[in-house]
Amino acid sequence: MDTIGLDETTTIEINNNSNNKHSSYSSSSSNNNSNNLIISKIPNKIIDSNNNKNNNNNKNNNNNNNKNNYYNINKSSKMDMDYLLDCVQKTHGLIKDLTDSMLISNDQEERKQFQKQLNESNNYLNELLSKLSYIKNNNNINNNNNNGNINSNNGTSFGEIKSIPLMSNETGFTNNKITNNFNYSENKNNNNNNNNGQEQHELFSTSNKIENNNNNNNNKINNENNNEKNKNNNNGQHIIPKIYISDHEMAPNSEFQNIDSISPSSQLICGESRLTPVSERNELTSPASSLPSLPSLPSSMPKENKENKEPINQQEEEEEEEEEDEQKKEEENNLVKMTTVQVENTQEKIPLAKSATISTTNKTIEIEEQEKGMDSEKLKKTIKSSSSSSSNLFNDFPKPFIPFVQSNYNTEERNEVLQIVKLIHYEYGVQIKDKTGQLDNYMYNINFNPPPQYMCNSNDINSNNINSNINNNNNNMSNNLKKKLLIISNEKRNKMGPQIQRSPEETYLSNHFDEEELSNYFSHSFMSPKIVKSPSSSNLNKINQNNQNNNNNNIINNNNNNNNQNNTTTNNKNKSNNEKNNDNNTVFNNNTTTTNNNNNNNNNNSSEKNKVIVFEKKEPGQFIFKKEKVAKLSTSLSYSNLSSSSSNGGTAEDEEYDRYYDSFHCVELVDEDLLVYDNEDIYFNDEVDQNKSPLISPSLSKSNTTTTTTTTTTTTTATYANVNANAIATIGSSRKINNTLSPNMNNNNNNNNNNNNNNNNNNNNNNNNNNNNNNNSNNTSPTLTTQENNGISNGSGNGGRKIHYRSLSHGIIKTPFTNNKLKTLQIFVPTEPYTCRLEITIEENVTVERLLIEVIDLCIKERRKIQYHKRQKLQIQQLQLLQQPIITTTTTVAVQSNNNNNSSNNNNNNNNNNNNNMTSPINQSQSLTSSTTSSNISSSSSSNAFSPPTVSVSNQLISNNKNGNDFESLTFPFLIYTNHRDFILKKSDENGEIDQTLQPIIRTTEIKKLKTDCFSLVINPKAIRDTTHHPQIFRVHIIHSSNNINSNSNNNNNNNNNNNNNNNNNNNNYNNNNNNNCNNGIVKSISFSNIGEVDQSSSSIAPSSSTTAATAATSSTTKDSVAVVYKSSSTLASIKASICKKENLELNLCVFMTMSNEVIQNEKITLVELNLPSVKLVYDQIKPIQKSITPFQSEGVVGNAPRPITKLLGPIFFFTPDNICEIKQYVVSKIGKLGVKKDRYMEISKDKIMYSQFDYLPSSSVSQNGFHNNNNNNNKEYYGGGVGGGGGFTNYNNFSNANLNNNNNNSNFGNGNGNGGINGNNGNNSGSNNKENGGTGAGIGGGGGLQLPNNNNNNNTTPLKNNKFFRSFSSAVIKTPYQLINDISGVGIIINKPNSFYLKCNNKNSEYSSTDADEIVAKIQFIIRLKKENLI
């Protein structure tokens, strides 16, 4: 075989498959360009002398070198190190993901598989590190060697010839020659003596069996040599072949330092691969099978030592030539096709491999050859084996890989807000050193990889700065977030493999957020919630709902049935607990958890306890309540079971209720987005004497649960202290709206309870009353305690679900946002009739003034929640009363007899019973004879829907009534002062008693300087005003525009009746309310604004009987009315702005109207000038434009409109601002060619133009005019008949600009034929085109109306003007003339469609397109964020 020397210029013509062009590469010995390809022959006479110990193996090595030839590719070893570094980073990421999956998994077999895969990954990582170490050492050796680099494979068989060893040094190529013969084999006898057991690198794959015999003969020598070489190779150092499978450009100047210091435990950020395998990728199967494969390399790389060269005998040369001749013959016999290589105008045939791909930095060269007679099946097997082994975890790069594979059902991209939050949690979680922080890190570790330009270079790869990208200052962390967000914005999730088992945490993190969750996540933090888990809450909700419906349908029968169940359950529980039951309503008991089984004494029958979750805002010290809603979760042991099954032991009825899950703490909640007050103060222990304080509960001082430990929760809670009985309750519960019975808050006398249980067959209603509403007061000194459980629970005691709490048992912790310590304080607030105790956790460096602001803000929020709770219950009552039949007299008599039996069985203890019989009209006789106050009577009157008391409770009632609904009577009279400067803070003892001798605390004092933890909020004496009488109230009734017309006539009479009732005494008020219940079926609630408190009995509203259940349901999200403190300087505009902000209404779509439905045009008028006791605020309605206002008020009106309108429509339009609408609504008039004027009504909302779909305003806003615009698909306009005559419009073409001044009668809008008046005939609805004959009629009213067909399809829309985006807002998809920003709950870009985006309204996505889609999306997202933050 002829050879080609390096001193000769070599030109190789190669067919490049990528571009089907010929490219020539030339090089010389002095050329060091990485793109040049040099083919030479290794001389037959080579002496391998690594050191003196290897001199005996030189001859064997020389013989082996003659049989294995390689390419010499001029690439620096730095490229090898880049490639290995990428592998190291990916392996680190794989190890981290496997570790996370193993910790999350609850299946033993799955954990074993993860452990096995983790071990394989660690072994592979060790191999990579050893190769890096070898390259480093080899480079050091080459730097000292100036005589060239002789490559010897030391007898190592590369098996299938997966790679080509590198031969290069700093000065370029050596002067040695290599043959043009390529020896590829399918040898399966790999080097088994390599320390790290590296895998075969599949750069080339061939099935040429010609060299099998040669390589098999070499393997014996190779193994012997390797055994000796490996003894001297302590680190298992290997060389990496310089073959790259990448179309990406590599980093040319990357250098690595401290390679030996890399350990498998080093935490590298997993980066994107800069290498894309040429072979086709397969789908990801498992992490273990996806390890990137590396070539098997020689165990040592001896360098040339010319001093130790020995001459080669002539006899050896002859033997070598004979072997070459034999090899040529074998090749010719096997029909190896020869590839032509031109060398200085001469042609020589060189045997090449069947397929070879050499990927350089920028270009890919392919040398292909087909073997004659090659079996196709064999070729397929070769290709299959190559592609399957080359498929690894890093397929489909440069996409980043994620820890959890997306499921098939979730095809939408993940919400950006969720990604941002989770990334923030990940960045903060990495900095935490304790175990709990690691668990948090596992939960929120999204592991999004930065792009290659952000990957750590060689300077970052050492043990000191492995995590430099994470553990640096805040600037670095924010930079990392920005880098990762770049990936999120451009990433579209595709499924990357088969489904895997998903835990609830994974399910939550992969789901989209709804509108409420988006707002919650802006204030998410690491604060630990105070939560006591109990699965019986949803069961309690269902039972309460059933009781509510059953009692309304048939009071006697259903009460008997319910009480039979209650009594049966009560008897069983009393026997099991030695006739000492702490909870009155044991039908709600759930014995499914081990907590109840081991804690029967104190909370066996307790339902859901108080749960208040407090999360810290971005600003330290600010708190917010938060709930997260996810799909219904199962408490089974399997994480993959995410169906809506009920809790362990729970009934199937639980499935109808949503469950809530705190993803950060892995705690399932049963609650809605608003917190509700609940009372859990009265829990007795069997060992506690009944005569002693009932407030000493072992459940509050020690933990009897089966979990290892539970948490101490420092959250913002509030407890009530009874003025007389000093009872204590806690603010906050996780209960649904209809969950108002709260049986766990009722304290039964066991003697009475047992007595009633013995007589339950005769007195069903009595037992129900006693089980739910008996309360024995024990006037003893209170012991203020809160729930305290110590430690951390990481086990699966709670239904098999992992629970993690952050330990706060030491009381003082550090927040992850700052280094400041947190301190828990108890603050007593002067609420009525109970004293409220707030427990707040805040930073130590916060001043007293800041603490006062937080306390006042919290009280305002709590008062809103109480009012919201009242409103919801009364609305439920309205819905159910409308559906109930009239109660007969027979029923009344039967119930009264039961009530009499009840009083006798209670041993005339009526003073201590709050007797709610779940009936409304029957309790009148009993309530009038009892000694309870009017609030108790009013409460029992509406107890059918669990109605709360409607007035402040007197001291006598406080001492006698500890019903669970007492919290609803809690008022905040001190909030008439909303400025924090009106309050001062004083030190107090643990019972809230203030030492009057002490001076108030200075407002600038820091919390950490105060020695005590108990304080009291006191109104500043300088701010006290005359509060002996309630201030005069100006009431604003909030009504939807669709409900305003239907209830016009009846509301006035009902409101007048209610105003008269307000002046009556309590009994008369009760009777009038009962009459209203019988006649109208509805009693609307009263709600307060933040300005002041009023007596609820002073202004109760009874709406009209025409109000339907649907109307009540639609108005459930908005208050019925708002009471405003009457001030002479208050204007309607300021009141409107305040109400719209708090009720989340669009300011521009709200109109003030009098109670007689007259629009109040001037909103700048004061209350004194208005001189009205109440007004209506009609929302979702456009204010009518007065006819006196014309589009041409002045000459210089052109350009008056804001820039968006001017830019959009141009100077052809004239704009007149509607001064009444506060420059928010505009009249747009267009002058046509013939001088015809068309008007449009437009509005500006958040830099977006929204305009109407009609030329005229709806009839609801201009009821005095006799026309109506129907916005349905038919687009018809109906006109009422004129006064005194028939006829109509004839030959009228421009009817859109019709003058309707003559239509003064009140016609029936929308019916198609207006009734002209008394005895008037119906109009004629038939006609052709624009010529219509109006109907003639006799009588006073004249003829009826006529119907004009709308032939102009575009007369109701604004000219398009090349703006698709704004036209889309008025499309049929949104179905509203104005697209409100409040309706948009989500917005995002559609990746697969350029210039397209979607809006999410009413849980439906609408797709739109615009040339500036990115700008539109950014603006709307910013608006949504601002609105959510304002709502928070």
Swiss-Prot record:
Region (Disordered), start-end ranges: 1-72, 208-237, 280-335, 531-607, 690-712, 738-801, 896-950, 1044-1076, 1303-1359
Q: Where is the composition biased (Low complexity)?
A: 14-72, 208-225, 284-300, 536-575, 583-607, 691-712, 744-779, 896-944, 1321-1333, 1347-1359
From what organism does this protein derive? Dictyostelium discoideum
| Acidic residues bias locations | 315-325
What name is this protein filed under?
Answer: Putative uncharacterized protein DDB_G0267840
Question: What InterPro entries does the record point to?
Answer: Prespore_vesicle_assoc (IPR053097)
Specify the superkingdom: Eukaryota
Bilayer-crossing regions: none
Q: Which PANTHER family match?
A: NUCLEASE-RELATED, SPERACT/SCAVENGER RECEPTOR DOMAIN-CONTAINING PROTEIN
Residue ranges annotated as compositionally biased, kind Gly residues, are 1311-1320, 1334-1346
